[in-house]
Amino acid sequence: MNVDKQRQEAQPAFVLHSYPYLETSLIVEVFTQNSGRIAVVAKGAKRPTSPLRGLLRAFQPLLLSWGGKSELRTLHKAEWQGGQLPLQGTALICGFYLNELLIRLLHRNDPHERLFACYQEALSDLSTASDYIPILRRFEQRLLQEMGYALTLDHDVSSGKPIKPTQMYCYEIERGPIASSNGSCPFNLELSGKTLLDMYQGDYLAPLTRLQSRILMRHLLSHYLGDKPLHTRQLLKEFQQL
């Protein structure tokens, strides 16, 4: 459901990306709590005396006010809320990865309040965690769920039977897991039942679960992203297999 494009006041938001516009302004992609992903023009934001200068940064909770009827709204005010620790090193790249997923997969002006809360929680977790894999996998799953493509992880979609930890399953994109009988599986998406159940419970401690869940999510996301690869995924590969 699209939201009203008229004036919005003090709406919680995060900057996803920004780029220069004309000589002194910025176009900013933001993820908002009640309006979803929108684009705003921050007029004069690059001027040394602008109150917006240095404020429109990624991963910092903001309160934004804007107006306008076009696809590109005009930012009127931004306030820093605080409370979010800065992301550094691999955590910073993970944050940019989440931002790129939101930009690429969410339609503008569609509210996703639960996903906004999940994103905020993921940023908080990234700032303190030493293991980033569970954070990324959970967010990826929630994102697909919000898009209407929730993963089936607890039962065989062909037979309806509960997943067995010792059984191997072939995961069919846009359907779900089916018990594997001959070992052949499209895109090599064969997973153990334990991996599926671990993902269902959000448990990514087992090495095989970490490996197979990464392969599964990479294929699922690529299916919805299309041919254009994610820039941040290559950066993550250079650091570690996330």
From Swiss-Prot:
Name the Gene3D superfamilies on file: Nucleic acid-binding proteins (2.40.50.140), Recombination protein O, C-terminal domain (1.20.1440.120)
Query: GO BP, one example?
Result: double-strand break repair
One matching Pfam family is: RecO_N
Name the InterPro entries for this protein: ARFGAP/RecO, DNA_rep/recomb_RecO_N, NA-bd_OB-fold, RecO, RecO_C
- This protein's UniProt keywords: DNA damage, DNA recombination, DNA repair
Give yes or no: UniProt keyword DNA damage: yes
Q: Which GO terms describe its cellular component?
A: bacterial nucleoid
Explain the purpose of this protein.
Involved in DNA repair and RecF pathway recombination.
Q: What family does this chain come from, according to its entry?
A: Belongs to the RecO family.
Instruction: Please name the HAMAP family in this protein's record.
Output: RecO
Q: What is this protein called?
A: DNA repair protein RecO
Species, as recorded? Nitrosospira multiformis (strain ATCC 25196 / NCIMB 11849 / C 71)
The gene behind this protein is: recO
